[in-house]
A protein has these predicted regions:
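Extracellular beta-helix/beta-solenoid repeat scaffolds
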Residues: 1-126
Length: 126
């Protein structure tokens, strides 16, 4: 199955959600051209953590999950961003996500995968 996206489009995996791409699923640009030209790319996949998540006690349902098995992400500015992204700033309290891949291919992306720093706002007082 192929999903084509316009330049401003992105896939968002919210906390508690799972996106599973299997057996040849293709996420790609609707405009095939020069992969280094932003006009021909789409935004990619964002996998979000939870702002209220405590990194010492991560609950399996509190974070977004991306599972890729023999699938392709191509022609994206960032294939997978493991954070919630606000252009031009990032939200460092939305990390702590899960990305699992087997046979994943990132083709003609400006950046394949980006893991940003995670700021733990939980302070254990015990």
């Amino acid at each position: 199955m192929t999903f084509k996206f316009s330049p401003d489009a992105k896939v968002i995996v919210e906390p508690g959600s799972t996106l599973t791409l299997t057996d040849g699923t293709l996420l790609t640009s609707n405009y095939m051209g020069d992969p280094c030209n932003v006009a021909y790319t789409w935004q990619g996949v964002e996998v979000w953590g939870s702002q209220s998540n405590q990194s010492q006690n991560i609950m399996p349902l509190a974070v977004g999950k991306l599972i890729m098995n023999n699938s392709i992400i191509e022609y994206a500015i960032c294939g997978v961003r493991a954070q919630k992204f606000y252009n031009p700033a990032v939200n460092l309290h939305r990390g702590g996500i899960i990305v699992a891949t087997t046979g994943a291919t990132f083709k003609n992306c400006i950046m394949d995968v980006e893991f940003l720093p995670y700021v733990n706002v939980y302070k254990d007082k015990t």
